[in-house]
Curated annotation (Swiss-Prot):
Belongs to the Diels-Alderase family. InterPro entries: DA_C (IPR054499). The gene is xenF. Hexane cyclase; part of the gene cluster that mediates the biosynthesis of xenoacremones such as xenoacremone A, a compound that shows inhibitory activity toward the PI3K/AKT signaling pathway and which has the ability to induce apoptosis of A549 lung cancer cells. Within the pathway, cooperation of the hybrid PKS-NRPS xenE and the trans-acting enoyl reductase xenG is responsible for the formation of the reduced tyrosine-nonaketide derivative. The alpha/beta hydrolase xenA then accelerates intramolecular nucleophilic attack to give a pyrrolidone derivative. It comes from Xenoacremonium sinensis. This is Hexane cyclase xenF. It holds the Pfam family DA_N.
Amino acid sequence: MSPAANMFRTLTLTALVSAVVSAYESQVPLNPQFPEYLNEEWDDSCSISKSTAYDVHDGPNTFSSSPSEDIHSVKISPHVNATNWEQWEFDGLSHTGLSGLLMAFSRDATYAFFGQGNLRVEFYITLGDGSIIQELDFISESYVIDCPDFTAGIWNSTDRSYSFYVTKDHQFARLKFDSWRVRGGFTMSSSTRPHLADGSPWTPDGGKPDATEVSPGLFYGLSMGGAEVDVDATLSSGKRITFKGRGGSTRLWATEGWLKLCDGWKVIRAWAGPYSIVYWDVLSRIDRGVRYVSGHLFYHDELLVGSRVGQPSDKADYVLFNDQFDGEMSGKYKDKNTGHHLEFASPARDKKWTFDVQHIVTQYEIGAGAGFGMSGFANRVVGGEVGGVQYEGKGQSEQTYWPEHIEEWKIWLVWGLGFLGRGKTYVMKLVGYVL
């Protein structure tokens, strides 16, 4: 790199750090009232879990991996501690693959050294014109309301809020957001049953004790394997965003932060004709170098294959996964795959289903330095039963590759952008250059 380029990078880095610190110092903890629209729906049969930005339990807490608890119920109580965390995730992609949305609500003290607490909302929108909205918002307080018929949550501060509402049969979800850059919501209608990491259906009667574990320390529930999504939102500029597509909802919780859990992960949610696909691939750091998988394949919303077996078997259903490198688009970090090949197999039925996933749109990228980072894509998907009809569809994927340690100044740039408020999306491009 030339001296001029080095100087520009240094000046850019200095400006970014100054902006983050300035934004951090100007923020004060808030105590907004809980919005009225949910008060009308809960009663004494509901339980309420409240967590403010600075509620971190000192020492061991109650951590549940029970397969019988509702997927969206709170798993960690009374609060997260310095290491464990939980997340509620919802996503959707338009039928064209050009517009997409992802929302994740977290209670996570991993980055408590920022001084902004443990409540985050990660919010990504990709628009058909190629523009991207990236909201990483640190919030003042959160509530999760668990009622007989629904689970609801809200992460809010005085000038912005994000909320979700999911029925207990996991067939319907409603999400709303009111932030600095975008306001609106989306609905999700699913006809797939909720499932657990081992492929078993979720029921209140429970399943195997380890049914929720996708890899050591990481737990997973599939609330919606495939859902119709309807998005309606308005940007601060006045531009309206509407699209229909497919998506789903995933629940994650863990005993440790991501950097202690794994080297990285790859996640796919896709559809093609009557098929819906959800796949998780985690390279563990707890079991050094061991790869763990969880795959679900639905046909007309009924589960065909659900398995944590990631190698060929004569008896058990399994799923195989390989990266491909012969396409046109890859991420800008170390992992240069252009797509993936998935194979689901059922030896008992003597059937296999294969799907090729090819990146077509980069939805977001966040760097961690030295070629490490995270990339999200929209994808073209082609596949079906081997020897049968092949279908074409779309999907979303995310891939990460993390170092064992990220210097705090880099975390400040990546995650600390949540302090920058309205300007953070624009600064993301400079961060990508610096890292």
